[in-house]
C-alpha cells in the first residue's frame, strides 16, 4: 500500500487554487464531473477517443486525457500528467477495474478521494463478508462450496462485474451444469470458478442504499436509493410462466440500468442503523474507514428486515439515478444534490479547513 505520507507529500506540491477533479469516463463520471464544476473545480476526464462523445455533448469536462486503452491509466506518463494538473482522482467501479486493484494500492501515486485501502474489502468476498458480518448486519448464509448446497442459492464472483455470470441454483448438479454453460460461453474462467461465492437466496424486494460518510462532520448521510434493471432476468419475467418453461433459458443478472425508488419511511431508522454500523466497524478493521460514498445492496423480506448481500466501498453506479438530486439528498440542503456534488463539497470544505488529509489517500 502506498503510504499516506507519500500521497500527501505529492499533494503538498500542488497549486491548491487549481485543483482538478478527475475520473475515468465511465460508470458515474457524469455526475462526478458535473458536481465538481458546480462547486467551482476544474474537471478532466480520462477516456479513449471513441468514448469521449458524452463528456463533450454534456460539457462536464474541461480537459480530456486520451488513452489508447483504459488499462493505460496506470502508466507513469499518465500519472505524471495527472499530477501536473493538480489532480484528485475520484475512483469508481470502472476506474478500479481498468487500473487494477494492485496498481491502485501499490503504484498509482496520484491523490485519491476516499480510503484506497478499503477497496480490496469490497473486491474480495471473504473480506466483504467479514466486514458486513462483524458490523452486526443480517447477511445471507454463506456456503463453503457446491457440495454444501442444500436449497436455493445465488452464486457470485469477485470484482466489479455488474452481475455478469451470477446465477441461482438449488443443487450441486445444477451448479456444475451452469458453470459448464457459462465457461463454454466465455463468461466465466476456471479462476472465476475457484473464487465462486455461494450464498443463501433471500426472497425480498431489492434496495440499493447509497450513503455518504463525512469525516469532517463525522456523520453518515443517506443520499438515495435505487433498484437495477438486469438482463436477461427483467426481460424473462415479462414472459408468461408457461412460455418461460418452453424457452428453457437460464437467466443472467447483468446490470444494464437503474431506477430510483423510495423506501417506506418506517424503515428509515433501520436504513440509518445499518449504515452507521458499517461505518463504525470499518474504522476498526481498515482505518480510517469508509470515507465518502458507499452503498449497501439489500433485500427487504416480508418481516420488514433488511438483509445486506453486497457492498460498494466507493461511489456506486446506482447514484446515476439522482444526478439532479434524490428525495433524500435534497432534504439536507433544500436543493438538488447529486453524489458527485456531495463529494466535491467535501473536498472543497476540506481545502478551506486545512483538513484535506482527512479525505485523501
Curated annotation (Swiss-Prot):
Pfam families, alphabetized: DUF1246, DUF1297
Binding site for ATP: 146-208, 230
Catalytic reaction list: 5-amino-1-(5-phospho-beta-D-ribosyl)imidazole-4-carboxamide + formate + ATP = 5-formamido-1-(5-phospho-D-ribosyl)imidazole-4-carboxamide + ADP + phosphate
One annotated GO biological process: 'de novo' IMP biosynthetic process
KW Nucleotide-binding (keyword) present: yes
EC number: 6.3.4.23
Binding residues annotated for 5-amino-1-(5-phospho-beta-D-ribosyl)imidazole-4-carboxamide, in chain numbering: 27, 94, 258
Pathway: Purine metabolism; IMP biosynthesis via de novo pathway; 5-formamido-1-(5-phospho-D-ribosyl)imidazole-4-carboxamide from 5-amino-1-(5-phospho-D-ribosyl)imidazole-4-carboxamide (formate route): step 1/1
Chain residues that bind Mg(2+): 297, 310
Cofactors: Mg(2+); Mn(2+)
Gene Ontology molecular function, alphabetical: ATP binding; ligase activity, forming carbon-nitrogen bonds; magnesium ion binding
Note describing how the cofactor binds: Binds 1 Mg(2+) or Mn(2+) ion per subunit.
Protein keywords: ATP-binding, Ligase, Magnesium, Manganese, Metal-binding, Nucleotide-binding, Purine biosynthesis
Highest rank taxon of the organism: Archaea
Domain (ATP-grasp) ranges: 116-348
Family: Belongs to the phosphohexose mutase family.
Function: Catalyzes the ATP- and formate-dependent formylation of 5-aminoimidazole-4-carboxamide-1-beta-d-ribofuranosyl 5'-monophosphate (AICAR) to 5-formaminoimidazole-4-carboxamide-1-beta-d-ribofuranosyl 5'-monophosphate (FAICAR) in the absence of folates.
Protein name as it appears in the record: 5-formaminoimidazole-4-carboxamide-1-(beta)-D-ribofuranosyl 5'-monophosphate synthetase
